[in-house]
Amino acid sequence: MARSIDPAPRAVRGFVPARTDEERFLMRHVEDLARAAEGRGIARYSGFLSDREQDLARAALNRADVPESDHHFEGGWPGAARKLLCLEPEGCYPASPLCCVKLTCRTLSGAALPGHKDYLGSLMGLELRREALGDIVLLADTPGTAYVFALETAGELICRELLQVGRTEVTTTLLSLDEVPEFPQAERKTQTATVSSLRLDAVLAAMLHCSRGQACEWIAAGRVEINHLPAESAHAPVYEGDVFTVRGKGRFGLTALPGKSKKDRSIIEFFQY
């Protein structure tokens, strides 16, 4: 694809402040954890946070003037999406509540294996709170095996109570983080397209190979999120690094905006999760 010589200036999406009572409560909770950690010199940990919740936590820590050296986010493996906030002041004794449960399917050869939604549904059926569960990792080279990152109390409950996922019987093994194997990084195929403008409807249409009108219908129906927040307008600008979720269609990451084509159309680079 032909490109212009001069790339477009790189713009980034700014922080979106808390919008709901739940988000404001989360920020206050993070500040309370930070004060307890600093005031008592002991480690404190949140539950698992989504990408959006991690952004809110960072804003709360910044507001509370917590040094970067006193906190980090940990999800159990390098590619984790859902992570704990770990507040560990200098000199404290770390006591992370993070663990991993290995689930192994007991099924006949050739039988259908559970997918991610099946595992999550069965885990939520144990009446676990979502913040007690991190990533669920399925590996292509070991079909029938899943690794569930969880808080220790949730991991112990999973080992006691989870007997099957869907119609498939499973065995459970509680692992320390040191026992978790190294997962291969997912290979994601980057795609390139050109759009008439860097508006949400145009970019979604290119990613999903549909018309802009169809993209607008999905946005109006509340099926589209940008960075885990509901998309409010088809005309919303998009930025490098944005993540788009379209219910029923998938999730897409906008990795780069290299500039303009010779036909003066904006070039986008993206991948599907």
Regions found by a protein language model. Give the residues of each.
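Ferredoxin-like alpha/beta domains used as RNA- or RNAP-binding modules
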Residues: M1-D201, M207, P230, F244, ...
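Basic (Lys/Arg-enriched) interaction patch that binds polyanionic ligands
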Residues: S197-G248
